[in-house]
């Protein structure tokens, strides 16, 4: 329904109820010099709805969307096709809310979808149990570090040199606020070789990423063995959930906790959010797992039902005993993830992953054939790093003028790490042969 403003009689009754003579009485404590009188400078007069739509459309046309031309940006957020069915499902009135389903008697539909979400995430990561989502991948990573410290009763967190810097920053923020020590290893494009060597008897967990921020796919099994040999945990992080359709999942590499981003499945780029954090772990750690957990039970009549269980958030118990203070979370984004995963199925996810990998191989072959361009990532899924003979920022600016969004300069993520000539490039199932040709042709003209 359209907005219906208050009538003068409504306002008079409201003022009389609270004992005020006029609306100005509310602002008696605001100095007169600080009050705005008259029109706001630059604000146009009101217009009809059609005129406003035209004006906003004109403003929006100044933007370049991810679908308006060749687009090769990744670095933690990826452009994938989202079936129209997903949006149809999440816009149903029964689901269109992020509020917590505290009352199971009236929220069985929402609780069941969360249960299915957990089942899918646990299967995807090859773990025993998953929670009902986190805010995003970076908060999942941070919560995993703090959880590991609780489990091991140690205070040292080791971050790999291939961990996404935004994830590292979120982890430092949360961990250091709780008195933990965070050790960041030097930036590493190729694998996690130094991670296993860094573990000692004081380490709570090591956090590795595969594919890492440079796209390198790494077997973390040796890191898991090294961590477990010292009584520490391995946290396996991922930013591209579609990769788990092909690469070895965290659980099969010996990880104790898997934390990552689910945006790639069912969710658009959304200007950087909202996204949906994925979090799973071994069953023996479930009581220390942050966030919500939806469980299956039976009601008084013996019928299957779903409820929130093991609620150890600070809203339920004492803060010092709580496993997290995550509040109303990414439930709607989790539903989008679940809907897309259900439509894909296991075979569909594998096929989607294969399309991504094939597109990336074609892109790497094409870019690698350009004189002066070097492919730096040895083993990749759908993203890799290239080195150009020119400054990366200048190259990307000229590509932009040619209508190609060429990727993310590595120096934006790692300032001062001698990566000024490195660009992170991603390809997905949305990348066409024409897109690759446009990139290659433009790059040849530039360098």
UniProtKB/Swiss-Prot annotation:
Keywords: Oxidoreductase
Catalyses which reaction(s): N(6)-[(R)-lipoyl]-L-lysyl-[glycine-cleavage complex H protein] + glycine + H(+) = N(6)-[(R)-S(8)-aminomethyldihydrolipoyl]-L-lysyl-[glycine-cleavage complex H protein] + CO2
Recorded superkingdom: Bacteria
GO MF assignments: glycine dehydrogenase (decarboxylating) activity
Alphabetized InterPro entries for the sequence: GcvPA (IPR023010), GDC-P_N (IPR049315), GDC_P (IPR020581), PyrdxlP-dep_Trfase (IPR015424), PyrdxlP-dep_Trfase_major (IPR015421), PyrdxlP-dep_Trfase_small (IPR015422)
Enzyme Commission number(s): 1.4.4.2
UniProt GO BP: glycine decarboxylation via glycine cleavage system; nucleoside metabolic process
Complex formation: The glycine cleavage system is composed of four proteins: P, T, L and H. In this organism, the P 'protein' is a heterodimer of two subunits.
Membership in a protein family: Belongs to the GcvP family. N-terminal subunit subfamily.
Role summary: The glycine cleavage system catalyzes the degradation of glycine. The P protein binds the alpha-amino group of glycine through its pyridoxal phosphate cofactor; CO(2) is released and the remaining methylamine moiety is then transferred to the lipoamide cofactor of the H protein.
Name by which UniProt lists this protein: Probable glycine dehydrogenase (decarboxylating) subunit 1
The organism of origin for this protein: Hyphomonas neptunium (strain ATCC 15444)
